[in-house]
């Protein structure tokens, strides 16, 4: 029988190489949109993942100010741009599978846990979100009135992307477009993909409120390589944003920070009604890796800490190295409300052609594979 160390991810180099692809690393909305958005929608989609109304588009095209003055909504928008009583009605397109819908609803339920905003299925409300799988991940900023499209294509169905787009829909801009951002990051324009400079424009000071510290880890901050050109010789993407603060890195932000939640609750005037996880950005002192330091560091370098496919594995084995300790605490406190991408499929079937071989090598029984066997070999492992 093939021996597979319980906490080693190096099975990627062995029998399971066929389904372990490092190229499937976690992607942000801007990356997905670069691949999926059609030319027609590119005319209306700006700043990576935001839509403009026709009126906003006209103002943008006629604007000669390098600072953005086109937005009908921002964190400092008027009450007409806000969702009444913090209630956001929504309709989920029937195009989504039951599994995708479960992830969507679960993500909304978690959003409610950290705030006093409520997402309710639409009945007769005139203003509502229509969540539909179009050609990317994008949203308007704040309420625009009537049926409001929020696109989440299949590749966008991940909790952190859903939260990011919902933050836009409620009224939040990107953190890296703050008027004061140049005091905290340097934008390397020479490394930006031609035609994508607009994604680094700053908002007008009069349009936003920013009494909080600059939040490098905000779920509304893009990673440091966003819209970066690819150096074909070295086969790497070039950095477009560099933190000015020593020791800080701009990574894929996949969860709310304490500052995100404070802003969210201040906008909704939540008081004591929401934000019970506002301290989640603090890593618990008991946070430890179970796997060896060498194994966890190797997993981190290969991108597995940020890959949703391996998320539960990393929480169990490398939570300290992967900086997933606060996420573990949230799972422990409220398992049923924590989004989980391992969802039950309607059809009982295997997703991988070699499940019979994997089953003989312990794939169906070893605890290490608890979080992936259902996705790949549900039928062979008798899980449905």
From Swiss-Prot:
Signal peptide as annotated in the record: 1-25
Tissue: Expressed in pharyngeal glands.
Keywords annotated in UniProt: Disulfide bond, Glycoprotein, Hydrolase, Metal-binding, Metalloprotease, Protease, Repeat, Secreted, Signal, Zinc, Zymogen
UniProt GO molecular function: metalloendopeptidase activity; zinc ion binding
GO biological process terms, semicolon-separated: proteolysis
Main location: secreted
Obligatory cofactor(s): Zn(2+)
EC class: hydrolase
EC number: 3.4.24.-
Residues involved in Zn(2+) binding: 164, 168, 174
Peptidase M12A domain boundaries: 73-271
A cellular component annotation (GO) from this entry: extracellular region
Organism domain of life: Eukaryota
Glycan-modified residues: 340
Disulfide links within the chain: 116-270, 137-156, 287-325, 296-318, 305-322, 348-384, 355-377, 364-381
SMART domains (alphabetical): ShKT (SM00254), ZnMc (SM00235)
SUPFAM superfamilies named in the record: Metalloproteases ('zincins'), catalytic domain (SSF55486)
Cofactor notes: Binds 1 zinc ion per subunit.
Active site per the UniProt annotation: 165
Domain ShKT intervals: 287-325, 348-384
Record localization: Secreted
Entry-linked CDD domains: ZnMc_astacin_like
Function: Metalloprotease.
Protein name: Zinc metalloproteinase nas-12
Organism: Caenorhabditis elegans
């Amino acid at each position: 029988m093939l021996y597979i160390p319980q906490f080693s991810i190096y099975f990627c180099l062995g029998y399971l190489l066929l389904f372990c692809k490092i190229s499937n690393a976690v992607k942000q909305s801007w990356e997905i949109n670069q691949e999926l958005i059609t030319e027609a929608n590119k005319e209306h989609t700006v700043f990576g993942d935001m839509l403009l109304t026709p009126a906003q588009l006209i103002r943008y095209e006629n604007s000669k100010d390098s600072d953005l003055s086109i937005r009908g909504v921002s964190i400092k928008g008027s009450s007409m741009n806000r969702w009444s009583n913090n209630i956001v009605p929504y309709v989920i397109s029937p195009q989504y599978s039951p599994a995708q819908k479960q992830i969507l609803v679960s993500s909304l339920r978690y959003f409610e846990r950290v705030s006093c905003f409520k997402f309710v299925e639409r009945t007769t409300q005139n203003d509502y979100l229509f969540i539909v799988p179009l050609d990317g991940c994008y949203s308007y900023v704040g309420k625009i009135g009537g049926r409001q499209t929020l696109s989440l294509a299949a590749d966008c169905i991940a909790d952190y992307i859903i939260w990011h787009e919902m933050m836009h829909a409620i009224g939040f801009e990107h953190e890296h477009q703050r008027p004061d951002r140049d005091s905290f990051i340097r934008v390397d324009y020479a490394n930006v993909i031609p035609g994508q400079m607009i994604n680094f424009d700053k908002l007008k000071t009069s349009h936003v409120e920013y009494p909080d510290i600059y939040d490098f880890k905000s779920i509304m901050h893009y990673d440091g390589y966003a819209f970066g050109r690819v150096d074909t010789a070295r086969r790497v993407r070039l950095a477009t944003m560099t933190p000015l603060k020593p020791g800080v890195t701009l990574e894929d932000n996949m969860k709310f920070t304490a500052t995100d939640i404070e802003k969210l609750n201040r906008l909704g005037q939540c008081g004591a009604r929401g934000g019970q996880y506002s301290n989640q950005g603090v890593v618990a002192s008991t946070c430890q890796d179970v796997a060896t330091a060498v194994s966890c560091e190797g997993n981190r370098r290969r991108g597995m800490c940020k890959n949703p496919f391996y998320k539960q594995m990393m929480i169990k084995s490398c939570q300290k190295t992967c900086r997933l300790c606060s996420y573990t605490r949230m799972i422990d406190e409220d398992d049923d409300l924590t989004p989980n991408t391992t969802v039950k499929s309607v059809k009982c079937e295997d997703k991988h052609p070699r499940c019979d071989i994997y089953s003989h090598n312990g794939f169906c029984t070893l605890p290490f594979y608890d979080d992936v066997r259902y996705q790949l070999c549900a039928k062979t492992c008798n899980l449905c």
